[in-house]
Amino acid sequence: STMFLTPNHKYILYNKLHLVPFAEYIPLSGQFPSLNNLNFGQGNFSHGTEYTVFKWKNTKFSNLICYESSIPKIVRKFIQNGANLITIQTNDGWLGKSAGPYQHYDIAKIRAIENRVPVIRSANTGISGLILANGISINEQPVGKTAVFTVSVPIGEAGSFYSQYGDVF
């Protein structure tokens, strides 16, 4: 889950919509309860149902949690609900020393381009940075580097043909 704490000390909660199979839940365990006896070291979480859009001054943003950035329809729905910025918090530690953290970052670039929306990505062990709506990376921090940085985010009119019509081809 993600919590957005407002200046007047109220909070808004977003619960992850798309859980990672075999890591955060066991698929079909509702239909076949004996699957719950499998132990892969997984969690047994419940997914959220709300496409939450947070508001801060003139910016409306939605947050993706880790694996959700690989699901195009989730970002599309956030944009349709009014988000003009996407943030991603992710744990890329499970990818180890592989191409995974780079691929995961590139997936975030694709989400920015296909929805014409800036993306801010914060990774605990992967690549962090700002991705502009055209896919160009700004202040990209490499895998394994600890960093804190401030960056100006150009907020424009989010949305594209894909945001409006989806997978029509």
Features from the language model and the residues they span:
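Enzyme catalytic cores with a strong preference for nitrogen-chemistry domains
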Residues: 1-169
